[in-house]
UniProtKB/Swiss-Prot annotation:
GO MF, any single term: translation elongation factor activity
Organism phylogeny: Bacteria, Pseudomonadati, Spirochaetota, Spirochaetia, Spirochaetales
Gene name linked to the record: efp
Localization (cell): Cytoplasm
Keywords: Cytoplasm, Elongation factor, Protein biosynthesis
Protein's name in the database: Elongation factor P
Biological process per Gene Ontology, one example term: peptide biosynthetic process
Native species: Treponema denticola (strain ATCC 35405 / DSM 14222 / CIP 103919 / JCM 8153 / KCTC 15104)
Length: 187
């Protein structure tokens, strides 16, 4: 059990026997009445989103989740294959669980996989990742106004808007939570 005031982003809670990942938490302390937390949670089984208000003094059930450090191997149909780096066991994660994170997966990279009741329920992607620009349009300097961007495609198929000076073959840092370009990376 966890107190409502102790709930943080990334916590996995149980709601009616289903695991939910806390994606946002806003603490509210009204002038009158008890403090509470407004929590936005993602259902880890079907991806639906639930908004819930929890008083800070109330307790909610937290899910007992194991975290396994795994290396991404390959995609086989609608399954993504990972290898546990400690036990060397294969872990198959369904495409529904991966969702829109597919383009952040790179063969050989390590990710944390959350396991609940012997079932993978989430793959944690690092907040920032470096990608190589595979496809990029070339623009002539002075062609547009300042602050202009263009779409590029990375080696994983991820599409990101970047400044016009980014060229094919360069490395860029991407914020995976917002899918936004952060900076060019010098190798």
């Amino acid at each position: 059990m966890i107190r409502g005031g102790d709930i943080a982003k990334g916590t996995v809670l149980l709601n009616k026997g289903t695991p939910y990942l806390v994606v946002e938490r806003e603490f509210v302390n009204p002038g009158k009445g008890a403090a509470f937390a407004r929590v936005k949670m993602k259902n880890l089984r079907d991806g639906s989103v639930l908004m819930q208000t929890i008083k800070t003094a109330d307790t909610v059930e937290d899910a007992v989740v194991d975290t396994h450090k795994c290396q991404y191997q390959y995609k086989d149909g609608d399954q993504f294959m990972f290898m546990d780096t400690e036990s060397f066991e294969s872990i198959s994660v369904p495409a529904e669980t991966i969702g829109d994170k597919e383009h952040y997966l790179r063969e050989g990279d390590e990710y944390d996989i959350l396991i609940w009741e012997n079932e993978p329920i989430d793959v944690r992607i690092p907040t920032k990742m470096i990608f190589i620009v595979e496809q990029s349009e070339n623009y002539i300097k002075g062609d547009t106004v300042s602050g202009a961007t263009k779409p590029i495609v990375t080696e994983t198929g991820l599409v990101v808007r970047v400044p016009l000076f980014i060229k094919q073959g360069e490395k860029i840092l991407v914020n995976t939570e917002t899918n936004e370009y952060q900076e060019r990376v010098n190798s």
